């Protein structure tokens, strides 16, 4: 049930023929009978929407934003990966969860998906100081609680998304290769395959780098755009080789006829409005060294000089 809820919330299930116009991305709207981002309905016109541009110097330090605790991220499994018509989506097991990081509860992972472009500077949904990245990966988690399902669904923190910007790097990212290799088997919507065994840590930067992040309250970036998401946008990017990034737009299609490559599956930036963006103490800045740390080596040098 948790996985089904997450799929429905993210618009991963496609309508049957004859139903009302379905939502799509801007690149599709000019070629197909579908609703582009400016016509998305439901909660998509509200005031606490995502994604946003994060101005790093304006983000407020929140000392409660400490380290995350990752459970099950090291599990190596052969996972189901699907072309859902909007993105590539990897289903995650019930044993994967996060806590800490200023979150109000434990959150269980349901799936991960990505957004991208053929252009290496416009494939991410969020931007940092106006700069966008080649891709963005979202790991979606649902709040674990003893209350009723309706109460969870209606709360403004029922979903926690970990967002990772993806940049082009000089070397192949071997941890990502099982997913990249699987793309050839899911080129058209509705197809799925099983990836070679891998863990979530294979996809991510080192855990030590995940102390630096930004936090705000927002929405899903696809219809129904529910304003129920605790967003965490990490400062440290994932790095893939350019060829790995371009595999997503060359191997995947929006349509059964393979006429439109899947690319630019990115919602335009939304207004921040009266919301605040917070950052962990280290995000966007170098932490000053404590005074004793500076004094000890200085005094040692002075003493060494006197004893010569």
UniProtKB/Swiss-Prot annotation:
Residues 281-308 form a propeptide. It comes from the Eukaryota. Zn(2+) binds at residues 113, 115, 138. CDD domains: alpha_CA_IV_XV_like (cd03117). Keywords: Cell membrane, Disulfide bond, Glycoprotein, GPI-anchor, Lipoprotein, Lyase, Membrane, Metal-binding, Signal, Zinc. It is found in: Cell membrane. Its EC number is 4.2.1.1. Inhibited by acetazolamide. The active site is at 86 (proton donor/acceptor). It catalyses: hydrogencarbonate + H(+) = CO2 + H2O. A lipid is attached at residue 280 (GPI-anchor amidated serine). Residues 21-281 form the Alpha-carbonic anhydrase domain. It is a lipid-anchor; GPI-anchor. Substrate binds at residues 221-222. It holds the Pfam family Carb_anhydrase. Disulfide bonds join 24-34, 44-225. Interacts with SLC4A4. Belongs to the alpha-carbonic anhydrase family. Catalyzes the reversible hydration of carbon dioxide into bicarbonate and protons and thus is essential to maintaining intracellular and extracellular pH. May stimulate the sodium/bicarbonate transporter activity of SLC4A4 that acts in pH homeostasis. It is essential for acid overload removal from the retina and retina epithelium, and acid release in the choriocapillaris in the choroid. This is Carbonic anhydrase 4. It comes from Oryctolagus cuniculus (Rabbit).
